[in-house]
UniProtKB/Swiss-Prot annotation:
Protein name as catalogued: Trypsin theta
Alphabetical keyword list: Disulfide bond, Hydrolase, Protease, Secreted, Serine protease, Signal, Zymogen
Subcellular location field: Secreted, Extracellular space
Signal peptide annotation: 1-19
Species for this entry: Drosophila melanogaster
Length: 262
């Protein structure tokens, strides 16, 4: 079953948004996710958050630092990317300045990643240098079990505070609190997705709050534990259509193996 993904896309020149919002039914991995309904936060509150950037400094996806030289992100963020043209900014509340910028020496995504179903939407980047923990740079642990439905989690990233007619895109890190919805519940009649939710996914939901079109690949966290990776969704912050994330516990073995072998 093919999925129609409707996205709110802020048309941009370089890294600056022109302020026009439209809709697109393009391939899911073409989107650049943005936090919807979030609030300003600081990197000190979420020091594992990183920005994936082009050589020119344009933010295109989020990611999570899991050890001194490994970043976890979504597979769809890495498809078609040349390692020499991907950089990671760490330790900054702003995606366009501050912190440190590190080159990437290797990247990989799950060999079972399916751009049609969005199953196994996980990838990693190996940094060109080891990064020590500081006040604003911390490693996040990988969850071993998916939290129960109803557990409060936080999604972070850079993006708009609205879900329609977004006139500006703040450069400050955003956070939004949502509630975990396990994959079986998300695939049930209680929500609208049905059979397109798979066991490599986990959902999270709160009315008018979501991770949507730059936040792709970013963290869904409970405490200092990474439970999900921003993957896809139908529209943004839509009623009974939760945001869908790659389920870290389900993909943990691949992440650890790839981290050790790259």
């Amino acid at each position: 079953m093919h999925r129609l993904v409707v996205l709110l896309v802020c048309l941009a020149v370089g890294s600056a948004c022109a302020g026009t919002v439209g809709v697109s039914n393009g391939d899911p991995f073409e989107r650049e996710g943005r936090i919807v309904g979030g609030e300003d936060t600081t990197i000190g509150a979420h020091p594992y958050q990183v920005s994936l950037q082009t050589k020119s400094g344009s933010h295109f996806c989020g990611g999570s630092l899991i050890n001194e030289d490994t970043v976890v992100t979504a597979a769809h963020c890495l498809v078609g990317r040349k390692v020499s043209k991907v950089f990671v900014r760490l330790g900054s509340t702003l995606y366009n300045e501050g912190g440190i910028v590190v080159a990437v020496r290797e990247l990989a995504y799950n060999e079972d990643y399916n751009s049609k179903t969005m199953e196994y939407d996980v990838g990693i980047l190996k940094l060109d240098e080891k990064v020590k923990e500081t006040e604003n740079i911390r490693y996040i642990e990988l969850a071993t079990e998916t939290p129960p439905t109803g557990t409060t989690a936080v999604v972070t990233g850079w993006g708009s505070k609205c879900y329609f007619w977004c006139m500006t895109l703040p450069k400050t890190l955003q956070e939004v609190y949502v509630n975990i919805v396990d994959w079986k519940t998300c695939a049930s009649d209680e929500y609208k997705y049905g059979e397109i939710i798979y066991d490599s996914m986990v959902c999270a939901y709160e009315k008018k709050k979501d991770a949507c079109q730059g936040d792709s690949g970013g963290p869904l966290a409970v405490g200092n534990t990474l439970v999900g990776i921003v993957s896809w969704g139908y529209a943004c912050a839509s009623n009974l259509l939760p945001g869908v994330y790659s389920d870290v516990p389900a993909l943990r073995k691949w992440i650890l193996n790839a981290s050790e072998t790259l």
